[in-house]
């Protein structure tokens, strides 16, 4: 499923999502960052990536709700702009099946957008990064915190992880990233679900291509 909230979109920080006005934003500035807890209707998820320049944030598409996106303490941080979500409803998925699962959130004018993870490390976007089985990755979710392991398999727009990567309810949408010794982390996925007993994420490379097709921008930081 692909859904765009009907409103003209341009790559500027002045964009507002459909139905959003500055008056709906919280009077107190909110820091928006990858790894923070977000709420939409009755869904609790993790924010995956924040582009401070575009003032757009990303999480899993299946986290979507019908109204505003808020922080843990229900302060409005923005509104949904676009989603793709074809996450299978069963307990299994074939490796050749394409999984798309992202949500783009246009951030409110009065929030502070940051790309710093809870660990203090910057999270950068390099959409051209190609993953390989056995590669070391980490995942951050609001329920499990940061857990690290390796890529188990690379599939059609998504990949699975093992050897230490954990997930529980609330971790959906969280960032999966390369965490080299020293320097910034590089996002490589948005956490999706657990398939065949393995935690899984949609590829950031594929997601970035979908974002470009849907919104005409490429998340970079």
From Swiss-Prot:
Gene3D superfamilies: Trypsin-like serine proteases. The keyword Signal applies. InterPro entries: Peptidase_S1_PA, Peptidase_S1_PA_chymotrypsin. GO terms for cellular component: extracellular region; peptidoglycan-based cell wall. This is Uncharacterized protein Rv1815. Induction: Positively regulated by alternative sigma factor SigD, probably directly. Coiled coil: none annotated.
